[in-house]
C-alpha cells in the first residue's frame, strides 16, 4: 500500500548527525537499552525496540499522538508525526497509523536516502569490525570469539534468528536448512527480486509485504534470509519479511502461538517447490535446473508435477506393497516423499534418558526397522482387494525404491491419546556418520557401496511436554564445527553434546555429496 503520512512524518535529514554511532543493526533502544530489533523514527531519529521486544517504538508513536483538547488544531498541528519508522536491520519501513509496511516514498525520496545512509553506516561498521578481527588474529590466538580449527584460527560467523513471538519452530527449521550446503547454495545464487513498476521501478525490494498480496515471493524472502545467516555482519537477523509471507500463503501459521516444526517444514518445502515450478523472477524453473548440470535425470524426483531443487535434493520414492491375506493378490504403488515419519516403537516409550540402565536404548535403526517391517493392517484399515471385490485383511510393507540426496527423518513424538496430544520423550540414539540405508532398499544389489551412507548435517530438538508449548532449537554442522542455534543465540558445541539430544527431526546428507564429489 502507499502510505499518505510520509510527507508529515519523514522529516529527518538522511545524513543526520542525530543518528547514534556504530552499526544500525546493533543500536540500542533509548528506553530499555535493548539492542534487539531496533527501529529508528523518521521524524526525530530516536531509536526504540520493536513490538516483539518491549514495544517502545509503538509507545513512542502513541505518546506523540496525545490530542490537543484545549486548543483548536491548526493545519500544522493536525499533521501526523512520529508514525513512520524504519527497521535498522532489514531497512523495511512501517507506518503505525496505517498499521502496515510502506512501499512508497516522499517526493524527494527521503526514505530511500535514509535507507542508503543506514546501509553505509552498517557497511562501515562491518569493515571496521573486520579490521579489528584481523588484528586480533595477528596479535592473539586466545580470544573468546575465536576458535582453533585444523591448526588455524578462524572467527565464528554464524548468525542467530530473532524470535518474533513463539517463532522458534520456524527459526530451528531455517537454521537447519541453511546448513544443508547444496540446498542453501542454490537459493543464495538466485537473482534478487526487484520491483519493476510504479514509483519504485528499478529499486530493490526491502520488504515483500510492500509489494501487495499478489506479488509476495516465498522464494525471494527465503533467499534473503539464507544470505543473511552466514555473511557474519550481525549477531542476529530478524526474519519479519519471511514471517509475513508465511502468514500470507500458509494461513495455518498465522498468529503467535507455538507451532509444530515438522508441519512447518513440510509446508515450507511444498510451497517453495510450487513457486519454483511456476518460475522465479523471470527465470523459468527448467532454466534454473538446467544450470545445475550435475543433477542427473534420475535424481530429479518429481512430486506434484515437474521437478525443482526441492525434489531434486529431498525427494525419494517409496514402494508400498500390500498383500491380500485371503487370495494372496499383491498390489504395489510408488509414492514420492520429501521426508519419512518414523514411529518410536512402543517397547521403548517409557525410556526417557540415554543414561537409564533398564533395558536397551532405542536406536534410529529400531525406528527405521519398525517403519519398513511387514505389518498386518487392523480392522479399520481393510484393503479393497480387486480380485476378491471386497475389503479384506491384508499386510503392508514399505521399501525405499530411491534414496534422496538429503534424507530427512521425522520422529513421531506427538500422539493423540483420548482428547490429548502427548509427547513421547524417549531418547533415540542416532549416528553422526555412516548411517547405512542399504538394508531398506528395494534393490540393494543395484546400489554402490557409498551411495547408501549418510552423515548427519542438522538436528531439530523440541524441549518441553507438548506440541503447543515448549521450545525448539537446532544443532547443525558447518565446515566441520557443530553449532547450537537457540533463536538469536548461536554457540559452538561438540559432538558429545549433539548425540545426547532428543532428536525430533534429523537431516542426513548423502555421504558422497557431503564429501564434495557431487555438487549441485
From Swiss-Prot:
Could you say which residues bind Zn(2+) 2 here? Answer: 29, 32, 49, 56
Matching Pfam families: UCH (PF00443), zf-UBP (PF02148)
Where is this protein chiefly located?
A: nucleus
* Keywords, sorted A to Z: Acetylation, Cell cycle, Chromatin regulator, Cytoplasm, DNA damage, Hydrolase, Metal-binding, Nucleus, Protease, Thiol protease, Ubl conjugation pathway, Zinc, Zinc-finger
Q: Which cellular component terms (GO) are annotated to the entry?
A: chromatin; cytoplasm; cytoplasmic ribonucleoprotein granule; Flemming body; nucleoplasm; nucleus
Keyword hit for Ubl conjugation: no
- Identify the InterPro entries for this entry: Papain-like_cys_pep_sf, Peptidase_C19_UCH, Ub_carboxyl-term_hydrolase, USP_CS, USP_dom, Znf_RING/FYVE/PHD, Znf_UBP
Which residues participate in Zn(2+) 3 binding? Answer: 41, 44, 60, 82
Query: Could you give a single Gene Ontology term from the biological process aspect?
Result: proteolysis
State the family it belongs to.
Belongs to the peptidase C19 family. USP3 subfamily.
Quote the entry's note on domains: Both protease activity and an intact zinc finger are required for H2A monodeubiquitination.
**Record-given protein name:** Ubiquitin carboxyl-terminal hydrolase 3
Organism encoding this protein: Homo sapiens (Human)
Amino acid at each position: 500500500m502507499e502510505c499518505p503520512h510520509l510527507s508529515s512524518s519523514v522529516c529527518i535529514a538522511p545524513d543526520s548527525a542525530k543518528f547514534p554511532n556504530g552499526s544500525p543493526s546493533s543500536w540500542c533502544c533509548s528506553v530499555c537499552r535493548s539492542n534487539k530489533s531496533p527501529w529508528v523514527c523518521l521524524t526525530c531519529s530516536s531509536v526504540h525496540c520493536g513490538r516483539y521486544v518491549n514495544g517502545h517504538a509503538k509507545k513512542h508513536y502513541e505518546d506523540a499522538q496525545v490530542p490537543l483538547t484545549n486548543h483548536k488544531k491548526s493545519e500544522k498541528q493536525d499533521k501526523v508525526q512520529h508514525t513512520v519508522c524504519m527497521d535498522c536491520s532489514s531497512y523495511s519501513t512501517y507506518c503505525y497509523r496505517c498499521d502496515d509496511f510502506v512501499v512508497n516514498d516522499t517526493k524527494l525520496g527521503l526514505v530511500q536516502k535514509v535507507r542508503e545512509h543506514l546501509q553505509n553506516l552498517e557497511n562501515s561498521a562491518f569493515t571496521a569490525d573486520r579490521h579489528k578481527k584481523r588484528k586480533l588474529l595477528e596479535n592473539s590466538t586466545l580470544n573468546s570469539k575465536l576458535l582453533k580449527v585444523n591448526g588455524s584460527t578462524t572467527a565464528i560467523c554464524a548468525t542467530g534468528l530473532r524470535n518474533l513471538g513463539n517463532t522458534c519452530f520456524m527459526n530451528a527449521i531455517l537454521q537447519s536448512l541453511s546448513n544443508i550446503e547444496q540446498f542453501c547454495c542454490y537459493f543464495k545464487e538466485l537473482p534478487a527480486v526487484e520491483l519493476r513498476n510504479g514509483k519504485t521501478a528499478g529499486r530493490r525490494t526491502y520488504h515483500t509485504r510492500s509489494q501487495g498480496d499478489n506479488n509476495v515471493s516465498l522464494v525471494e524472502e527465503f533467499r534473503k534470509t539464507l544470505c543473511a545467516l552466514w555473511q557474519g555482519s550481525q549477531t542476529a537477523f530478524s526474519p519479519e519479511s519471511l514471517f509475513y509471507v508465511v502468514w500470507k500463503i500458509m494461513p495455518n501459521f498465522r498468529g503467535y502461538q507455538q507451532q509444530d516444526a515438522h508441519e512447518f517444514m513440510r509446508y515450507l518445502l511444498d510451497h517453495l517447490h510450487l513457486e519454483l515450478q511456476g518460475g522465479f523472477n523471470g527465470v523459468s524453473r527448467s532454466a534454473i535446473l538446467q544450470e545445475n548440470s550435475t543433477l542427473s535425470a534420475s535424481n530429479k524426483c518429481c512430486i506434484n508435477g515437474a521437478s525443482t531443487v526441492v525434489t531434486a535434493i529431498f525427494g525419494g520414492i517409496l514402494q508400498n506393497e500390500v498383500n491380500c491375506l485371503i487370495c494372496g493378490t499383491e498390489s504395489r504403488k510408488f509414492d514420492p516423499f520429501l521426508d519419512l515419519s518414523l514411529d518410536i516403537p512402543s517397547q521403548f516409550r517409557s525410556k526417557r534418558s540415554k543414561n537409564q540402565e533398564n533395558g536397551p536404548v532405542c536406536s534410529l535403526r529400531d525406528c527405521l526397522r519398525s517403519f519398513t517391517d511387514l505389518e498386518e493392517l487392523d480392522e479399520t484399515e481393510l484393503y479393497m482387494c480387486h480380485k476378491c471385490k471386497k475389503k479384506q485383511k491384508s499386510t503392508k510393507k514399505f521399501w525405499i525404491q530411491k534414496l534422496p540426496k538429503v534424507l530427512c527423518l521425522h520422529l513421531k513424538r506427538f500422539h493423540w491419546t483420548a482428547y490429548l496430544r502427548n509427547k513421547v520423550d524417549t531418547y533415540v540414539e542416532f549416528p553422526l556418520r555412516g548411517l547405512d540405508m542399504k538394508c531398506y532398499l528395494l534393490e540393494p544389489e543395484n546400489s554402490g557401496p557409498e551411495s547408501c551412507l549418510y552423515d548427519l548435517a542438522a538436528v531439530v530438538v523440541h524441549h518441553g511436554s507438548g506440541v503447543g508449548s515448549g521450545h525448539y532449537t537446532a544443532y547443525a554442522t558447518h565446515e566441520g564445527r557443530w553449532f547450537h542455534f537457540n533463536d538469536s543465540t548461536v554457540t559452538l558445541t561438540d559432538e558429545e553434546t549433539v548425540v545426547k539430544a532428543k532428536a525430533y527431526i534429523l537431516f542426513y546428507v548423502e555421504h558422497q555429496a557431503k564429501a564434495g564429489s557431487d555438487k549441485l
